[in-house]
A protein has these predicted regions:
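Conserved C-terminal active-site "lid" loop/helix of NAD(P)H-dependent oxidoreductases
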Residues: 96, 100, 120-149
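Residue-level signal for the nucleotide or nucleotide-sugar donor/cofactor binding architecture
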Residues: 63, 93, 137, 153
Length: 167
């Protein structure tokens, strides 16, 4: 986990160095968990692969792919070289809540809640690292500086739209 964090920080530093050395304007985007068509809790629930893992107090921020696009376009119309932006929706939530909402939309019984300690026994180290920290991120800067108005401000709004689109 620390190695991944360090590599991300190093990558950001490299991009900012490129800007300094060559005058190439750079924006850095730190993306929350990405979902959208073909990659979402509805699909997982329908395929029977969704899991409701409970780790008390654990939440994750997410972002719909369409809102990522909106943010990137906004950054081009409001350039501020060297800025770092967190790109996420307005509501971090436990993954078990996201799965439960997807199942509700589909009319399926949600899978049983599995305590993290139990689920971790069968997880890869990478999967376990995902649960190591809360992933609550604030998006104030994209709204304030770039004027982004999220189409999907919550995972519920995003899943509802995906469901309505036949996902």
């Amino acid at each position: 986990r620390r190695v991944l964090f360090r590599s991300r920080v190093a990558a950001e530093r490299d991009w900012l160095d490129l800007q300094q050395r060559h005058g190439v304007p750079v924006h850095i985007f730190r993306l929350a968990g990405i979902y959208g068509p073909g990659r979402n809790a509805l699909r997982d629930a329908r395929e029977g692969t969704a899991r409701r893992i409970r780790k008390p107090g654990q939440v994750f921020s997410r972002i719909h792919v369409d809102d990522i696009t909106e943010t990137l376009v906004a950054s081009m119309t409001h350039p501020d070289a060297g800025r770092i932006y967190n790109v996420c929706d307005n509501e971090a939530a436990p993954s078990e809540d996201v799965v439960a909402h997807a199942c509700q939309l589909l009319g399926l019984a949600p899978p049983p809640v599995v305590p993290f300690e139990e689920a971790a026994k069968a997880m890869s180290e990478m999967a376990k690292s995902f649960y190591a920290d809360n992933k609550r991120v604030r998006n104030d800067r994209i709204k304030r500086e770039l004027g982004v108005a999220l189409r999907f401000p919550t995972y519920r709004a995003g899943l509802d739209a995906l469901f309505a689109a036949g996902e």
